[in-house]
Amino acid sequence: MLKELINKLLWHPDYNPEDYNITYLHRGAKNDEKAVPLKNIVIEDSFLVFDETHVPFHRILEIVNLKTGEILYKKR
């Protein structure tokens, strides 16, 4: 489901990837969280890739619409 949501936000003409941020678990960062703009992400198998960083899907904490503040995904 998460991979499908990200693909939809990246490729569906109704959505603009520049409007979304993905927050993920990153040990050592402030609050162990880091955020990256969706527009910088490439999907490979079970990972998100950006700037040579690989983030497994299970580390994704939240996907937020930056314009509206709507949370599209939040890890339980």
Curated annotation (Swiss-Prot):
Pfam families: MJ1316 (PF04457). Belongs to the UPF0248 family. HAMAP family: UPF0248. This is UPF0248 protein MmarC7_1289. It comes from Methanococcus maripaludis (strain C7 / ATCC BAA-1331).
